[in-house]
């Protein structure tokens, strides 16, 4: 392991964190704060990108090193978020919005896994 790769992972993380903030702000502006659509969006998009990344590595279109670390750990690690997803659901529970909470859990899990599967299989060799 080199310090250069750590720097690239950190750079990917910085870009991912900024992207997450921008997506969240855009979603609040467009849809309001009634449902955590920003968290859902970054989780689904990030899962799709992860599927594409792994397919690119599997097809040998990208070298696993450093791309899995820079994009997978750095960028996507900062873009997607389980802690915010968890807190969004705690807040929905506290508001008594159990239907919204259930929808949020189901949508995040189903859409994120589906997006990862689609991204991966979209680029895999037949």
Curated annotation (Swiss-Prot):
Query: Taking the first listed entry, what is the main subcellular location of this protein, grouped into a coarse class?
Result: membrane
Specify which residues bind Na(+) according to the UniProt entry for this protein: 77, 80
Q: Which GO terms describe its cellular component?
A: plasma membrane
Gene designation: fluC
Asked if the Swiss-Prot or TrEMBL record annotates the protein with the keyword Cell wall biogenesis/degradation, the reply is: no
Q: What does this protein do?
A: Fluoride-specific ion channel. Important for reducing fluoride concentration in the cell, thus reducing its toxicity.
Q: How does it sit in the membrane?
A: Multi-pass membrane protein
InterPro entries, per the entry: FluC (IPR003691)
Q: What is this protein called?
A: Fluoride-specific ion channel FluC
* Family to which this protein belongs: Belongs to the fluoride channel Fluc/FEX (TC 1.A.43) family.
Q: Which domain of life is it from?
A: Bacteria
- Positions of transmembrane segments: 3-23, 37-57, 70-90, 104-124
């Amino acid at each position: 392991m080199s310090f250069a790769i750590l720097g690239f992972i950190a750079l990917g993380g910085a870009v991912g964190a900024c992207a997450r903030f921008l997506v969240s702000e855009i979603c609040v502006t467009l849809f309001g704060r009634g449902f955590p659509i920003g968290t859902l969006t970054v989780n689904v998009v990030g899962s799709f990108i992860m599927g594409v990344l792994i397919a690119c590595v599997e097809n040998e279109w990208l070298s696993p090193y450093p791309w899995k670390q820079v994009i997978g750990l750095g960028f996507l690690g900062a873009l997607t978020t389980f802690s915010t997803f968890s807190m969004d659901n705690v807040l929905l529970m506290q508001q008594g919005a159990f239907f919204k909470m259930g929808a949020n859990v189901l949508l995040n899990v189903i859409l994120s896994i589906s997006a990862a599967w689609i991204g991966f299989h979209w680029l895999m060799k037949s």
